[in-house]
UniProtKB/Swiss-Prot annotation:
Family under the similarity heading: Belongs to the ligand-gated ion channel (TC 1.A.9) family. Acetylcholine receptor (TC 1.A.9.1) subfamily. Alpha-6/CHRNA6 sub-subfamily.
GO biological process, one term: synaptic transmission, cholinergic
UniProt KW keywords: Cell membrane, Disulfide bond, Glycoprotein, Ion channel, Ion transport, Ligand-gated ion channel, Membrane, Phosphoprotein, Receptor, Signal, Synapse, Transmembrane, Transmembrane helix, Transport
Classification via InterPro entries: Neur_chan_lig-bd (IPR006202), Neur_chan_lig-bd_sf (IPR036734), Neur_channel (IPR006201), Neuro-gated_channel_TM_sf (IPR036719), Neuro_actylchol_rec (IPR038050), Neurotrans-gated_channel_TM (IPR006029), Neurotransmitter_ion_chnl_CS (IPR018000), Nicotinic_acetylcholine_rcpt (IPR002394)
Annotated source species: Pan troglodytes (Chimpanzee)
Cytoplasmic side: 328-465
Gene designation per UniProt: CHRNA6
Protein name as catalogued: Neuronal acetylcholine receptor subunit alpha-6
Stretches assigned to the Extracellular side: 26-239
Source lineage: Eukaryota, Metazoa, Chordata, Craniata, Vertebrata
Entry annotated with the keyword NAD: no
Catalytic activity: Ca(2+)(in) = Ca(2+)(out); K(+)(in) = K(+)(out); Na(+)(in) = Na(+)(out)
Gene Ontology cellular-component annotations: acetylcholine-gated channel complex; dopaminergic synapse; neuron projection; plasma membrane; postsynaptic membrane; presynaptic membrane; synapse
Length: 494
């Protein structure tokens, strides 16, 4: 006989033993029930037979695509790489059970290779397997509904138009359908009208504007049957910030540096140097960004057109600069200025361009600067032969000192012509007068030459100013015209 103390100890130990091991037994019972259910479902199951009670009935498959990542868009090879989840839902009448008979089990996770699956493939796959691998498990409910959502990475073919690169939009499609079953055997139904993007990771280069799905029934030339497919169209837009900062803005700066060439004075001697420096910088820049631009010969990208436009722009600036410098350094001994050049470039265009001479020039100042008496002075040896008064000779020997004083006063109060005509004509004076006349004639010739050279320089300045405005207009409107094309093109498509 056990004492009351011993009975209490035995009762407590039994309760503890039951509390510890009862969940284990329940788990074992549950595992046994699930194993019994699995054996019951798949003991006579054939995974190669369509799950229909009547052979003429189609299997209705509900299909949906969920995108998690837009991995890459290869413009050169025209491939779009995406990470997708493909949701398949269909009913298999051979996989039904009563939950009451199996301890309330309502769902099973079963390997996908144990059940019949629709052979849904990506029609426009470019690289890799066309069909999804069945390594994931499917969710089976007691009423026979199967939900299978395998992940897949697809590299699909996508015809791309990079005309407006880097402001381009692309329309890439994913076409899913059964490869062997026609519409009479598998009827595909789309879940929703758009791609599920709840778990989508944003891409740093592309933005998905729209991703709509459509169902198509197509009859191919190879077969008489009608095949059903579901096509998802991804309308994507390139994010142009990277290319704008690293490609377009530097080109804009180079273009406007080219415009400054025409504002640089020709006398500084650095116009051609600046043009060549800009051209070299553009060439080096093109070599650096060659790998960034899609290499294709089908179309010329917008940024390629702009780079070509900038290259032509800089080259023309060099040609025009050489032409302007040629005009700037012309002289009367090498070129004669035509009358139409004087009319157009010295009168008309300066008024149109709001240009004027820095100082008002009086034409003919060079000739007026030469004393008329010296210009009409007789040749040496003939100064006293005609028209010289006789009493002047006699008075010259008698009153030499008085005449010198009088000559000084006359030099200060009378024109030079009067002084020459009424002064002494000794050989020394004649030499001085001839030297002054030679200097005056040289000054006149120099002034006339300087005046013509100034006219040529002013013509070069006018030509520079004309091309300054022409290049500014071409640069602004050319740049705006190129980069407004994507906006106008997208507006026209919409």
């Amino acid at each position: 006989m056990l004492t009351s103390k011993g009975q209490g100890f035995l009762h407590g130990g039994l309760c503890l033993w039951l509390c510890v091991f009862t969940p284990f037994f329940k788990g074992c019972v549950g595992c046994a029930t699930e194993e019994r259910l699995f054996h019951k479902l798949f003991s006579h199951y054939n995974q190669f037979i369509r799950p229909v009670e009547n052979v003429s009935d189609p299997v209705t498959v509900h299909f949906e695509v969920a995108i998690t990542q837009l991995a890459n868009v290869d413009e050169v090879n025209q491939i779009m790489e995406t990470n997708l989840w493909l949701r398949h839902i269909w009913n298999d009448y051979k996989l039904r059970w009563d939950p009451m008979e199996y301890d309330g089990i309502e769902t099973l996770r079963i390997p996908a290779d144990k059940i019949w699956k629709p052979d849904i493939v990506l029609y426009n796959n470019a690289v890799g397997d066309f069909q999804v691998e069945g390594k994931t498990k499917a969710l089976l409910k007691y009423n026979g509904m199967i939900t299978w959502t395998p992940p897949a990475i697809f590299k699909s073919s996508c015809p791309m138009d990079i005309t407006f690169f880097p402001f381009d939009h692309q329309n890439c499609s994913l076409k899913f359908g059964s490869w062997t079953y026609d519409k009479a055997e598998i009827d595909l139904l789309i879940i929703g009208s758009k791609v599920d993007m709840n778990d989508f990771w944003e891409n740093s280069e592309w933005e998905i504007i729209d991703a709509s799905g459509y169902k198509h029934d197509i009859k191919y030339n190879c077969c008489e049957e009608i095949y059903t497919d579901i096509t998802y169209s991804f309308y994507i837009r390139r994010l142009p910030m990277f290319y704008t900062i690293n490609l377009i803005i530097p080109c804009l700066f180079i273009s406007f540096l080219t415009v400054l060439v025409f504002y640089l004075p020709s006398d500084c001697g650095e116009k051609v140097t600046l043009c060549i420096s800009v051209l070299l910088s553009l060439t080096v820049f093109l070599l650096v960004i060659t790998e960034t631009i899609p290499s294709t010969s089908l179309v010329v990208p917008l940024v390629g057109e702009y780079l070509l436009f900038t290259m032509i722009f800089v080259t023309l600036s060099i040609v025009v600069t050489v032409f302007v410098l040629n005009i700037h350094y012309r002289t009367p001994t090498t070129h004669t200025m035509p009358r139409w050049v004087k009319t157009v470039f010295l009168k008309l265009l300066p008024q149109v361009l709001l240009m004027r001479w820095p100082l008002d020039k009086t034409r003919g100042t060079g000739s007026d600067a030469v004393p008329r008496g010296l210009a009409r002075r007789p040749a040496k040896g003939k100064l006293a032969s005609h028209g010289e008064p006789r009493h002047l000779k006699e008075c010259f020997h008698c009153h030499k000192s008085n005449e010198l004083a009088t000559s000084k006063r006359r030099l200060s109060h009378h024109p030079l012509q009067w002084v020459v005509e009424n002064s002494e004509h000794s050989p020394e004076v004649e030499d001085v007068i001839n030297s002054v006349q030679f200097i005056a004639e040289n000054m006149k010739s120099h002034n006339e030459t300087k005046e013509v050279e100034d006219d040529w320089k002013y013509v070069a300045m006018v030509v520079d100013r004309v091309f300054l405005w022409v290049f500014i207009i071409v640069c602004v409107f050319g740049t705006a015209g190129l980069f407004l094309q994507p906006l106008l093109g997208n507006t026209g498509k919409s």
